[in-house]
Amino acid sequence: MAVVLDLLANDARPRHPEKAHRPDQPIQRKPDWIRVRAPGSPGWAETNRIVREHGLVTVCEEAGCPNIGECWEKKHATFMIMGDTCTRACAFCNVRTGLPQGLDGDEPARVADAVARLGLSHVVITSVDRDDLRDGGAGHFAAVIGAIRQASPGTTIEVLTPDFLRKEGALDVVVAAKPDVFNHNLETVPSKYLTVRPGARYFHSVRLLQRVKELDPTMFTKSGIMVGLGEERNEVLQLMDDLRSAEVDFLTIGQYLQPTKKHHPVKRFVPPDEFRAYETTAYAKGFLLVSATPLTRSSHHAGADFARLKQARLDRLATA
């Protein structure tokens, strides 16, 4: 049996203790259309240095994103706030599970300084789930947004938030901080929630996105899913309809990649032509922007996509 360990303070501890009892699931060889360049360029090294100097966590590293080499080469990093330990135990996710430490009051300033040092025109801020906090970390999100606005006024801000389940008023706090894009991922179709995302509720997540538009109709909303988890095509199409009923603007669809033998297995590698078909269908259903490729991830090309998103809204208004 394989147990994934982290080396912290010279002590090995399980990264995913809740998964240690599970039988190993073989990791399939990736098809040729899922190949990426190994990180190591000068841009990557500079991004890595700035992240380390500021004592920050990135979802690029913690989630094992396949695009880290490409993004960090361009000095694009997605900062993961409120620590590196999540209170949830999703079957697809490589982020450490456990009891998190208290919030770091200096983190907003460090994130803001790193954004300025990297010269980011657009930044994505995400977080672990913090079910242990009264507001789920909403106030910390707002503090980070405020600090970035002060340190780098020209930077547009995208947040990728947890679901704030049973955190009354938390969403209002984040929306009031005025991020340019509010992203919350559904991750998968509802039939897979019990095994893939057991701590979450599908229709709560849909309602969260709908509520953002009620609070601020001008705010761009975004959501993403993974395919290859055993979902059926008709389920993905219904999910698109659910998101459009919540007036979500931007949909991302990418291939699920299994982090370790203890995680949910890849049921299928979806070929590129099926991603193109999903993209065509999603546009027909009314999304302003769709990104659907095997390597699509929520924050991949986020800055360029934000520019496209703004233009798509202007184009639609012009033809209304």
From Swiss-Prot:
Q: What class of enzyme is it?
A: transferase
Q: What's one GO MF term for it? A: lipoate synthase activity
Q: Name one GO cellular component term.
A: cytoplasm
Q: Which reaction does it catalyse?
A: [[Fe-S] cluster scaffold protein carrying a second [4Fe-4S](2+) cluster] + N(6)-octanoyl-L-lysyl-[protein] + 2 oxidized [2Fe-2S]-[ferredoxin] + 2 S-adenosyl-L-methionine + 4 H(+) = [[Fe-S] cluster scaffold protein] + N(6)-[(R)-dihydrolipoyl]-L-lysyl-[protein] + 4 Fe(3+) + 2 hydrogen sulfide + 2 5'-deoxyadenosine + 2 L-methionine + 2 reduced [2Fe-2S]-[ferredoxin]
Compositional bias per record (Basic and acidic residues), positions renumbered to this chain: 12-31
Instruction: Provide the alphabetized UniProt keywords.
Output: 4Fe-4S, Cytoplasm, Iron, Iron-sulfur, Metal-binding, S-adenosyl-L-methionine, Transferase
Region Disordered: what ranges? Answer: 9-31
**Domain Radical SAM core residue range list:** 72-288
Positions contributing to [4Fe-4S] cluster 1 binding: C60, C65, C71, S299
* Location in or out of the cell: Cytoplasm
Cofactor(s) annotated in UniProt: [4Fe-4S] cluster
Annotated residues that bind [4Fe-4S] cluster 2 are located at: C86, C90, C93
Q: What is this protein called?
A: Lipoyl synthase
Species: Methylobacterium nodulans (strain LMG 21967 / CNCM I-2342 / ORS 2060)
Gene responsible for this protein: lipA
